[in-house]
């Protein structure tokens, strides 16, 4: 275990970094990425606020879509990169763990000029990245309700898995053409992880640590 952005993270699991890397490319990998910061944004001026604090065009984002974006600082430099997700009328922003407090303070400093509310959801909502060629077929097999996201990258949907309502997004940082990030109530994340691992381990799915992810 190593410290990363104030979180204890597994550098690797029992298979080691190389096998975790190759396993993700060939079959699929399970990554606990709950250390990433998650902020919920809502309120009448949410779009105007997001247009003000982010570099990408948040207004162009349709429901159940996501986009990569940057958080500029007050001088036009870079504070952090982030991912913005839209479900229905709500938005949530995923930021880097090491910048979470700094990003939160920066966003709050601008929120007072808008009719908008920010909620810190990092501890309430956990994240699993499920990345690699076999991931979609495994998810489809386990699906208990809802439907998978549209096939284009950056699409979202709501699914039921392991008795839990989950937001599934076709996003991820591994470079794999097929992969998902799953947003899960924290009290249910262990159940979902175990369900995915049990279903995928016979097909080569591995738990993957920070070393292989980097």
Task: Give the role of each language-model region.
Residues 1-214:
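Glycine/proline-enriched, intrinsically flexible loops and inter-domain linkers
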């Amino acid at each position: 275990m190593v410290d990363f952005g104030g979180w204890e993270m597994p550098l690797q699991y029992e298979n080691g970094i190389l096998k975790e890397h190759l396993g993700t490319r060939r079959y699929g990998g399970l990554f606990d990425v709950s250390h990433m910061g998650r902020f919920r944004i809502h309120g009448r001026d949410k779009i105007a606020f997001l247009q003000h604090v982010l570099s990408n065009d948040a207004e162009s984002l349709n429901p159940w879509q996501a986009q990569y974006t940057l958080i500029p600082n007050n001088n036009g430099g870079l504070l952090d990169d982030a991912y913005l997700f839209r479900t229905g009328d709500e938005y949530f922003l995923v930021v880097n763990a090491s910048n979470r407090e700094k990003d939160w303070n920066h966003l709050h400093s601008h929120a007072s000029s808008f009719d908008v509310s920010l909620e810190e959801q990092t501890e309430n909502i956990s994240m699993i990245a499920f990345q690699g060629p076999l991931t979609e077929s495994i998810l489809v097999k386990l699906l208990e309700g809802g439907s998978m996201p549209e096939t284009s990258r950056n699409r979202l949907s709501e699914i039921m898995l392991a008795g839990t309502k989950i937001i599934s997004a076709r996003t991820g940082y591994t470079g794999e053409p097929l992969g998902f990030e799953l947003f899960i109530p924290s009290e249910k994340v262990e159940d979902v992880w175990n369900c995915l691992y049990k279903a995928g381990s016979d097909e080569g799915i591995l738990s993957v640590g920070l070393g292989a992810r980097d």
